[in-house]
Structure formats: C-alpha cells, structure tokens
A protein has these predicted regions:
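Conserved beta-loop-alpha segment that forms the PLP phosphate-binding cup at the N-terminus of a helix
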Residues: 1-38, 49-53
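A glycine- and small-aliphatic-rich helix-loop capping segment at beta-alpha/alpha-beta transitions
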Residues: 16-28, 58-62, 117, 144-148, ...
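Substrate-binding/gating loop at the entrance of the active-site cleft, primarily
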Residues: 44-60
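Active-site phosphate-binding strand-loop segment of PLP-dependent enzymes
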Residues: 56, 68-137
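Conserved active-site segment immediately N-terminal to the catalytic lysine
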Residues: 130, 144-155, 164
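Active-site C-terminal subdomain of aminotransferase-like
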Residues: 154-242
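Conserved PLP-binding catalytic core of the aspartate aminotransferase-like
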Residues: 252-260
Length: 260
C-alpha cells in the first residue's frame, strides 16, 4: 500500500507508466511482446475513465477502448455491457493492463460485484486489472487479489483531500530506469511505484495531515463493523432514495438503469 499525491488524476499517468514498465520487465526479452508498445485496454463508462483514456493517448501509442458507454449516458435503461461484448485486445498481444473506473460519480455507472470473473479466464490470468475506486472504496467489499492495481483519492470515503492511496501487486513494482524498452518513457520520480515502495511512501514529503485524519477514519470504520457494515448502511439509505424516486418519477429522471 502506497501513500502518494496527485489525486486520481495523477494516477491516470502513474498507473499507465508503471504498467508499461512492468510489462517491459516481464516481456522485454519476448520477441512477440518486447519490440513495440503493448496495447492497453480501457473501459470508458463516464467522465473519469474518459479522462484516463485522454491521458493515456498522450503517453503511449496503442490505446484500445474495449467498451465505450458515453453514448449510452442519458438512456434510463442503460446498463454496463457484459464483458463478453467488449473488444478486448487479444491475449497473445500481451496487453499491459485493463483499466476501469469502479463507480462514475458524474454519469452513474457502477460496476457490479464480481464482474471480473466474467472476463475470459486467459485474459484474467495474464492481464493486470487496474481500478479507480475513488468514489466507492470502503462502501462494499472489493476483491483485491483480482486486481493488479487499485487506487483511490481519500477525499470521498476515507479522509481529506491530499493523499492518494495505491494498492499494488508486488510483482508489478519494477525499476523503470533499469529497462531497455523504448516504449517506456521516463517516469517522474514521484510517480514511480518502486520509489515510493522502497522508501515507505516517504520518497518526498508526504501529506501528513491527510494521512493522519484518514487513519482516524479507518479506525472509526473498524469500530463500526468494517466494510460489510458500511455496505449495509449504504443499502438501507439507497433503498430509501430509490423508493422515493419511484413514487415521484416526475421529480427526477435517472440517467442509467437502477442496477448500473
């Protein structure tokens, strides 16, 4: 677990660059995978994942939008398409990652629990999955082991803004300066996961107050029953909201289907 800065927007760059480095470290000597930039897959479900794609296109050449839901926004029956309908990069092209945003706060799409198990098995086993969980972290259980990277800004569910927490699988933490792959650009030092991991998140001055207050929030969460209890409280509150909206459909028109 790393404590970084730059918010979720900083991780749009950091996740991509570090995953390209991890790809080069693993596949650099493979003649099929090491000669050119690998594809990176993105699922665009709203404004935040769209911004992540825009940043990726600045930094690498093979950005594949596996599913784009932007055109569906505003349709009250819109739902997240099943992964078997996505245009994922072929596994034999060694994609560097699959990126998605767990919950789009602006446009309303939230991925269902356990959706990753619906991806093709070979894809799940070979491609690191990167999740932006900024707006629903600690609101429900998340399968950390199914992901390569999970990041979240503290300001929505954890504590004050200023700290960004990143959960990284250990085998994906590599030294980008030791690589020879031309498709890995120089990474700013404070965005390198290895720098932060090797220095206990103290590579540069950390946002101490934000970390301290977040710690208070974590302790309170545990005292109140942890994530399962928080999920149940959220369920009760959301049911009240949705039932009220159903009674007064003229007051608010949903932009996506309820399960989304």
């Amino acid at each position: 677990v790393l404590f970084m800065q730059g918010g979720g927007t900083g991780q749009f760059s950091s996740t991509l660059l570090n995953m390209l480095a991890a790809h080069a470290a693993k596949h650099g000597n493979n003649s099929n995978a090491g000669a050119c930039a690998p594809p990176v897959d993105y699922v665009v479900s709203g404004a935040w994942s769209k911004k992540a794609v825009q940043e990726a296109r600045r930094l690498t050449s093979r950005v594949n939008v596996a599913s784009d839901m932007i055109s569906m926004i505003g349709d009250p029956n819109a739902e997240i398409p099943s992964p078997d309908k996505w245009q994922l990069s072929p596994v034999d092209e060694y994609p560097a990652m699959l990126y998605y945003c767990e919950n789009e706060t602006i446009h309303g799409f939230e991925f269902p629990e356990h959706w990753i198990q619906r991806l093709p098995q070979a894809y799940r086993e070979r491609v690191p999955i990167v999740a932006d969980c900024s707006s629903n972290i600690l609101s429900r259980p998340i399968d950390v082991r199914a992901h390569g990277v999970i990041f979240f800004g503290a300001q929505k569910n954890v504590g004050p803004s200023g700290v960004t927490m990143v959960i990284v699988r250990r085998d994906l933490i590599v030294d980008p300066d030791a690589l020879q792959a031309s498709y890995v650009p120089p990474i700013p030092a404070t965005l390198v996961y290895k720098n932060m991991a090797d220095n206990g998140s103290l590579y540069n001055t950390p946002p101490t107050f934000s970390i301290y207050v977040s710690g208070i929030g974590f302790r309170k969460l545990l005292l109140d029953g942890g994530v399962p209890a928080a999920q149940e409280r959220a369920r009760i509150k959301s049911e009240l909201v949705y039932k009220t909206l159903d009674v007064f459909p003229h007051v608010y028109r949903p932009t996506v289907a309820h399960p989304a």
